[in-house]
Amino acid sequence: MYWNILGEFDLMNSFFIGNVEIEKTAALAPMASVADKSYRLMCKEYGASYLVSEMISSKGLCFGDKKTARLCEIEKEERPYALQLFGEDPYYMGKAAYKLNEYSPDIIDINMGCPVPKIVGNGSGSALMRLPDTAAEICREVVKNADCPVTVKFRAGWDENSINAVEFAKLMEQAGASAVTCHGRTRTQFYSGKADWDIIRQVKEAVKIPVIGNGDVVDGESAKAMYEQTGCDLVMIGRGSYGRPWVFRDVKHYLETGEKLPEVSIEEKMAVMKKHCELICKYKGERQGMKEARKNCAWYVKGLKGSARLRAQCGGLNTISDLYEMIDHILANELGE
């Protein structure tokens, strides 16, 4: 329990999705081109209780695309872990789910919430919220072919005039989903404005399966607030983890004690950035790894002295030595050495 004896906040320490037990702290959201293996491992090290992969193309998997297959690779340290599929065709989604079994994910998640035009234009992601019958058939096919529990991630609705998260959640439950994740924004909002947590509350009250809440959780206080206001079984953090994987440690500490941890020191921040970039290079090679590390470095240096200049400098990082040199300069500047 968190807080307990008349200390108001009262929360069980874990819950189950099917037969998979998950600690009730905070999960890392699936984020394409962001939450790769290195990113997930950093968040796991800092306490993320549940991880979801970058979205995996069902057709890419079925047609043997090697890049797609690499997205399915799991490190044992990542568990409990979900592989997330996207696609618009029930047949290929079912076939892809069957192929995912060989990677032994703890959970298979279905993406019905991505707002990106390229995905929506193909009838995938949040476009499926306007095609509930197809969405239900996709869920049934994935459940039928998966060897593990299946979950579905979706949004509040397509736009403010078509909020259908409650009905959609019920449909997914009927189609065999073991849990759902609701992002409190509509597709047309993308990531602007505020997430409507009341919609997450309504979803939680409407179904018997676990509900994960997503949108605007950025620290311990907002995590506690989402738990209290929605009754959700788990909170999920996406953009709030950019350049701050320690947010999961902060959330867990706050839920357990009601106290905020001190701000991360510049020394720890730089050590984490260094380790993160080294992991990226380990899995993707130095040349490609440093290209992909640039955006992460830009997030890590946000708020530091001369951050605009530092972010520009991040865009020119080509080697791990470049990174080490930049870190030395940052520490000297911040610590006055």
Q: What spans do the regions from the language model cover?
A:
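Active-site beta-loop-alpha junctions enriched in small/polar residues
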Residues: M31, I56-S58, F86-E88, G113-P115, ...
